[in-house]
A protein has these predicted regions:
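A short alpha-helical cap/connector motif
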Residues: 2-166, 172-197, 201-278
């Protein structure tokens, strides 16, 4: 059996800690939270400082424009700051006939918004617990009635709709509902797919805690080479590209294709002698 490769950087870090002497480990999560609490809102005088780089403010995207123009007809209820995140993560699907699932139909307006945004050929699947939402079915839009907190409902759902491109959870907003939905649908996203969960509110939110734990998997390491530094990705790292956090919103992106290795090669010929890593 091949001996496991040492993580030389971690070995050196542990050695440096030992040299400083034993100290009680601080609660890093609490420290990070406290650091965020210490930020004050900018005063008017601070806002008047000249920025280091001047850029034009971003123009409203198509989704924001659709929302602002929706003065009549089926209702759309969204936080305005969501639209920038939508455009950032979902623009790649425009014109590519994606299969989109939105949990939480409510008054139906967002179904039409997604249909207009993604363009001809997209398939929109709205999920809601209320039978009245069947009224919003139509061309390219299917309505499925069910309880998003029920794993049995999702088991039947993925038998019908196995491969998904986009999931937007705007459903009941309870952590147990959000977790059940994520665990059922995140694995069903195609390569490059995007999972968005809205309305993750409150600093002591259980779905937020769940995502904190989920994100730790991105930092797993199984070293297979020191020169060049190479890590064999875990199953999670192979399939999940990134987890993004915004006020009240979480976006998870699947990798465009399975990742074979995580590698840190050295480029260049001149190196300081104080670090003799790979």
């Amino acid at each position: 059996m091949t001996a496991p490769v040492r993580n030389v950087w971690w070995d050196r870090l542990r050695g440096a800690r030992s040299a400083r002497g034993a100290r009680p480990e601080p609660d890093r999560a609490a420290a990070g939270f406290a650091f965020g609490q210490g930020w004050a809102r900018e005063s008017e005088s601070e806002r008047e400082r000249e920025p280091t780089a001047i850029a034009e403010p971003p123009r409203p995207g198509r989704l924001a424009a659709h929302f602002e123009a929706n003065a009549e007809g089926p209702g759309i209820w969204k936080w305005r700051h969501y639209f920038e995140a939508y455009e950032r993560h979902l623009a790649k699907f425009v014109g590519r006939s994606p299969r989109v699932v939105e949990i939480g139909v409510y008054s139906g307006g967002s179904l039409e918004m997604w249909k207009q945004y993604f363009g001809t050929g997209c398939e929109i699947i709205g999920v809601d617990i209320e039978e009245a939402c069947r009224a919003y079915a139509g061309p390219s839009v299917e309505i499925v009635i069910g309880d998003q907190a029920d794993p049995a409902f999702w088991a039947g759902f993925v038998e019908r709709f196995d491969a998904l491109d986009v999931v937007i959870d705007d459903g009941g907003h309870l952590p147990e509902q959000q977790i059940a939905t994520l665990e059922a649908l995140l694995p069903r996203l195609r390569d490059g797919g995007v999972y968005i969960c809205e309305d993750v509110t409150g600093v002591e939110n259980e779905f937020q805690d769940y995502c904190d734990g989920l994100a730790r998997n991105l930092n797993a390491e199984e070293w297979i080479s020191e020169s060049p530094a190479t890590v064999k990705p875990s199953g999670f790292q192979t399939q999940v590209h990134s987890i993004h956090r915004y006020p009240f919103l979480v976006a998870i992106e699947r990798t465009p294709e399975p990742v074979a290795e995580l590698i840190a090669p050295r480029h260049g010929t001149e190196w300081q002698p104080f670090f003799d890593g790979p």
